[in-house]
Amino acid sequence: MAEKAPPGLNRKTSRSTLSLPPEPVDIIRSKTCSRRVKINVGGLNHEVLWRTLDRLPRTRLGKLRDCNTHESLLEVCDDYNLNENEYFFDRHPGAFTSILNFYRTGKLHMMEEMCALSFGQELDYWGIDEIYLESCCQARYHQKKEQMNEELRREAETMRDGEGEEFDNTCCPEKRKKLWDLLEKPNSSVAAKILAIVSILFIVLSTIALSLNTLPELQENDEFGQPSDNRKLAHVEAVCIAWFTMEYLLRFLSSPNKWKFFKGPLNVIDLLAILPYYVTIFLTESNKSVLQFQNVRRVVQIFRIMRILRILKLARHSTGLQSLGFTLRRSYNELGLLILFLAMGIMIFSSLVFFAEKDEDATKFTSIPASFWWATITMTTVGYGDIYPKTLLGKIVGGLCCIAGVLVIALPIPIIVNNFSEFYKEQKRQEKAIKRREALERAKRNGSIVSMNLKDAFARSMELIDVAVEKAGESANIKDSVDDNHLSPSRWKWARKALSETSSNKSYENKYQEVSQKDSHEQLNNTSSSSPQHLSAQKLEMLYNEITKTQTHSHPNPDCQEQPERPSAYEEEIEMEEVVCPQEQLAVAQTEVIVDMKSTSSIDSFTSCATDFTETERSPLPPPSASHLQMKFPTDLPGMDEHQRVRAPPFLTLSRDKGPAAREAALDYAPIDITVNLDAGASHGPLQPDSASDSPKSSLKGSNPLKSRSLKVNFQENRGSAPQTPPSTARPLPVTTADFPLTTPQHMSTILLEESPPPGTETLPGADVSAHCQGPSKGLSPRVPKQKLFPFSSRERRSFTEIDTGEDEDFLDLQRPRPDKQADPSPNCLADKPGEARDPLREEGCVGSSSPQNTDHNCRQDIYQAVGEVKKDSSQEGYKMENHLFAPEIHSNPGDTGYCPTRETSM
């Protein structure tokens, strides 16, 4: 069922970006609640009645009402919003206006400025046939469509001819391609242009030599007394023929398709230009006798005449001549019609003039075939005057023949001229189209233009949809896939990747822009399978012991050695942000700012998250002036046994400006007493000395650090009654133990708190954290080493800001005052024993962070929660836990009764 949009976000957003797929009953209810439906096409909203869409039930909009499941709806529309009863189609909004009017009026018209092909595609998408177009628009639509289809067909043929030049399947493809471009594409290079000019010069020279050979002054008589070619001109012709032969052979050898080369009209002309020369040489050299030569001479003359075809070789280098040839080939219908008209006129008028002039003396119209010449010359309006009619009837027939000739020739000639003009323009357009296509291909190869066809768009949309449904048999991985069952593409900006310990901090800004997820009861009720409350304490202890044992063995002195790189089979990187409170700023200790951020190991529990904090590059909120963060942890207490070593929490050093000078106080806390209660029997096993429990069911109680600190760990293992984790609303910082050489058990703090601890677990009044800045107790001061400081900005942190940098850039600030303990059901780890007075200062609850290893890639739920919403949750009133890291409060002034400023960073 669709979830409610969290506060601070746009509630009018579409369904698919914020919620799970709705149930069919919700879809049916949304359609039946209103007689109208909103259709959003390309951002333009339309409102129409359902019954209007029912007029064409077989169309896309007609099928919309019958789609009652999420999958069927997405097959019809691109997105939908049931709350607004709105369906979105990412199509052309202008064309949809005509289509929607067709539903309303039953008449389909095409807009004047609309492209015919584009409108046809829109009709196909909406499921409307083009035959419904009105007569006023149908002729224009089909004319434009046929014209565009013809142009596209010609362009496709040209591109197909270009793509057919494949040299991969032949030997020396690169060299052959260069040679082919050199001979066939004069514009490909300067050398190709020079070669084309040389070829043109040889054609002109051969034509001139052929013409000069016919001059009697330059001819020579052979041994038989017959005129023959001049020897010098014969040598010139031989050189030209040699050039033509070499050019033809090189074209043939470099051509990608030999059969296509032979069929080419230009190549046929080249062959006819050189073939007569070799045939003439063969015939003259093989027949030396006079009789044989006389018989062969006529054949040789025919081939000598064919030499004139060399002039047609210029068509290879002239676009105009090529256009003329293609025009004649494409205008064969008009040319045939012209010849038919002329033949009919010639036959009619030659017969008439013959019968009109046959009785005259010395007439030249002796027969009808003899009159064909006169009729042809007359109809073409040439009029040589060698033959003409003399009688009156003959002259009348001649006049009618002239008029008929003008009409017959004038009709088909303009069609041929138009074809030539159109073909010439098309040639220019195709040249530009080829250049544009080549530029687009280069841009696609370079990655500057992405193909946006339907298949690519569908593939990208399918990549975004990743619904993980775990089977019953895959119980081992069910904890990692519970929160994957959603279709929100905006949630998949967070990808799980394993990075080295030396990875750059800048990668966080691009790789992990996690979008905040919504608050839903389903997510809160999934704690039985995905919540870290069901982690076994024994497993966490064993895991942490392995980590700490590896670190202590490899680094006896962690302060002096670097932690070696150890491969992590499973790492997660989580971006954490500092929560900046818009309240008063306090002076801070002058400490060094840590600017290095590392990755977070998923196998580390929150107890081993020793971290540097820096938000100067990552947080969208400007940090307060001179606000620095530094973490330092207490070292081992000398003289303590293994069971007395625990991880003390990092403490705050505050400096608050009360007057002219800032006052700073640093406290050293030394835990000296530990009481461990195991309520779960022997199932958890004994608590290891140097292990920290990651179980959210444990609770460590802090006492007054100035006197003694009593810590209690309670393990209550009950899977059926696991407490649900209320939403925490601060973004975690990227931390990992793999990146810090100081992540030993002495440098880590785990405090797991319960709101209502079991009876008997309350601490003494002295166990509360003191607000007075005193030195350590006298009994402990000689044995407690100097603690490392963890100074924060000294300001009150009674509010937190949830930052969502992934999608909405909305900032939600929740101010929550902390009421008295008796009325506050919020988690608190410090409790007084029954009947004893409480410390007048407020205690700051600290809670455990869920272990990253138990969560999947989108497990971090940034849940928006209004003020007091936790109190209203009846299912969690009795037993609530909150997972976050915190720094306990330390009041710098004994007289201050205000709340201790804390800095919370929740995971």
UniProtKB/Swiss-Prot annotation:
Cellular location(s): Cell membrane; Perikaryon; Cell projection, Dendrite
Query: In the UniProt record, which residues carry a glycan?
Result: 287
InterPro entries found in the cross-reference section: BTB/POZ_dom (IPR000210), Ion_trans_dom (IPR005821), K_chnl_volt-dep_Kv (IPR003968), K_chnl_volt-dep_Kv2 (IPR003973), K_chnl_volt-dep_Kv2.2 (IPR005826), SKP1/BTB/POZ_sf (IPR011333), T1-type_BTB (IPR003131), VG_K_chnl (IPR028325)
Q: Does the keyword Signal apply?
A: no
Intramembrane parts occur at: 369-380, 381-388
Motif Selectivity filter, chain ranges:
381-386
Its assembly, as annotated, is: Homotetramer or heterotetramer with KCNB1. Heterotetramer with KCNS1 and KCNS2. Interacts (via phosphorylated FFAT motif) with VAPA and VAPB.
> What is the name of this protein?
Potassium voltage-gated channel subfamily B member 2
